[in-house]
């Protein structure tokens, strides 16, 4: 198990290539199950969660080919085992995304209840409710979701699905399943994240008929079959946002190549209000900052897209810890998503938490210490804090970081950070 050693105090300058989005890549790997023809995915990030998903697909009989830095080719023509066993899904929440494609393509699936970050329950009941409306019979037994088509059905059927809450993975599961369903499916209260729109574009390239993706109401007309395609995974807005916060905190001038400013409106608005200069360019996003100590702390409330993303809450909190003034942060999406606060306190931050609300009082300095990552985005938060802390910070349990960031320490080192990965 590795850890990161960070010696803070360096400004960041240069360029960082933004990788493909984890939250787009994982559903797109699952979407390849919908076709018997090969699918090629470009800009696929090298992440632990991606590796786990590829092992799961291989277990099902799916062929996977990937060169060192080239495209990823997936051939589900020989799909023979529509199952996702616990030993392969226990570390990855996104494994539930195979449920819809397997039902649509094979008419049956057995998927263990998934694991992933310990930041809340994130129940699968909405998935079960929606797929049941499409003609599936689903029971949960011994930790597995066992699904099959209702008696007499050969395909899923179109349905009108209005979820009780906005669910990203639920929207993705219904979207994929509906492409091969009989008739029309309408998704109300659909999640609007850019990664869902990117998934829809991939499905359309495979022959799906989809309208309204990127809005809260999506219409899908089912087709008999989908063919293969080539698709480029959209840039990771959370990785880009993380680097924006890092540069804002340390000070410097960095171009995030391939970054999509239009996917980060809420975060960029807060960074500009704090005093950072963030520019949307044709080839990415440029951020210039005098450093966190000269910025003004900004409060925010996490909400579904296009609001402030919960996946950026921890990283922006790290910036607030050294900015001027006091900020109030309200987390509305997940419970237990302030676990990074105790670790920030070890670095000298001043934060008070009351339920879903955290109040951060900016401090003139943080001091390096050993801290422990508790989840994916908390890991990134602690890295940012370490970049500005005086002395050395050691971040333990960075396997969380490897689940969602492609070579983060190498990218930071390339723009001037004093950071290295060492055995724990």
From Swiss-Prot:
GO molecular function: UDP-N-acetylglucosamine 1-carboxyvinyltransferase activity
Chief localisation class: cytoplasm
Protein residues bound to UDP-N-acetyl-alpha-D-glucosamine: 93, 122-126, 311, 333
UniProt catalytic activity: phosphoenolpyruvate + UDP-N-acetyl-alpha-D-glucosamine = UDP-N-acetyl-3-O-(1-carboxyvinyl)-alpha-D-glucosamine + phosphate
Pathway info: Cell wall biogenesis; peptidoglycan biosynthesis
Subcellular location per the Swiss-Prot or TrEMBL entry: Cytoplasm
Broadest EC class assigned to this enzyme: transferase
UniProt entry tagged with the keyword Transferase: yes
Pfam families per record: EPSP_synthase (PF00275)
Residues annotated as binding phosphoenolpyruvate: 22-23
Domain of life: Bacteria
UniProt keywords, alphabetically: Cell cycle, Cell division, Cell shape, Cell wall biogenesis/degradation, Cytoplasm, Peptidoglycan synthesis, Pyruvate, Transferase
EC numbers: 2.5.1.7
Residue positions, PTM 2-(S-cysteinyl)pyruvic acid O-phosphothioketal: 117
Active site: 117 (proton donor)
Family recorded in the similarity comment: Belongs to the EPSP synthase family. MurA subfamily.
UniProt function note: Cell wall formation. Adds enolpyruvyl to UDP-N-acetylglucosamine.
Alphabetized HAMAP family for the sequence: MurA (MF_00111)
Protein name: UDP-N-acetylglucosamine 1-carboxyvinyltransferase
Organism: Verminephrobacter eiseniae (strain EF01-2)
């Amino acid at each position: 198990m590795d850890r990161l050693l960070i010696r803070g105090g360096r400004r960041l300058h240069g360029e960082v290539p933004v990788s493909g989005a984890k939250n787009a890549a994982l559903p797109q790997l699952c979407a390849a199950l919908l076709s018997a023809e090969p699918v090629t995915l470009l800009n696929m990030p090298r992440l632990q969660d991606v590796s786990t998903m590829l092992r799961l697909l291989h277990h099902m009989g799916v062929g996977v080919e990937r060169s060192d830095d080239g495209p990823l080719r997936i051939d589900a023509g020989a799909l023979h085992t529509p199952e996702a066993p616990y030993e392969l899904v226990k570390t990855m929440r996104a494994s539930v995304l195979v449920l819809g494609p397997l039902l649509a393509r094979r008419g049956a699936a057995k998927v263990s209840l998934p694991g992933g970050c310990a930041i809340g329950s994130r129940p699968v009941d909405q998935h079960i409710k929606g797929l049941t409306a499409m003609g599936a019979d689903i029971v949960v037994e011994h930790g597995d979701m066992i699904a099959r088509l209702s008696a007499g059905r050969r395909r899923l059927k179109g349905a009108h699905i209005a979820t009780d809450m906005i669910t990203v993975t639920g929207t993705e599961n219904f979207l994929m399943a509906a492409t091969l369903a009989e008739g029309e499916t309408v998704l109300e209260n659909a999640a609007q994240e850019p990664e869902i729109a990117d998934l829809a574009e991939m499905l359309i390239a495979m022959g799906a008929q989809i309208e309204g993706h990127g809005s809260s109401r999506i219409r899908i007309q089912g087709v008999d079959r989908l063919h293969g395609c080539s698709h480029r995974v959209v840039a990771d807005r959370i990785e880009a946002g993380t680097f924006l916060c890092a540069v804002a905190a340390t000070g410097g001038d960095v171009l995030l190549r391939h970054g999509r400013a239009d996917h980060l409106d809420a975060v960029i608005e807060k960074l500009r209000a704090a005093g950072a200069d963030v520019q949307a360019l044709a080839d990415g996003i440029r951020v210039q900052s005098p450093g966190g100590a000269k910025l003004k702390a900004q409060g925010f409330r996490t909400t579904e897209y296009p609001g402030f993303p919960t996946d950026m809450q921890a990283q922006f909190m790290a910036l607030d810890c050294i900015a001027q003034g006091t900020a109030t942060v309200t987390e509305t999406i997940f419970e237990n998503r302030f676990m990074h606060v105790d670790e920030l306190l070890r670095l000298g931050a001043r934060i008070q938490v009351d339920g879903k609300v955290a109040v951060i009082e900016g401090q003139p300095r943080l001091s390096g210490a050993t801290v422990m990552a508790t989840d994916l985005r908390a890991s990134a938060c602690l890295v940012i804090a370490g970049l500005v802390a005086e002395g050395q910070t050691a971040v333990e349990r960075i396997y969380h970081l490897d689940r969602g960031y492609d070579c983060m320490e190498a990218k930071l080192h390339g723009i001037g950070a004093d950071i290295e990965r060492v055995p724990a």
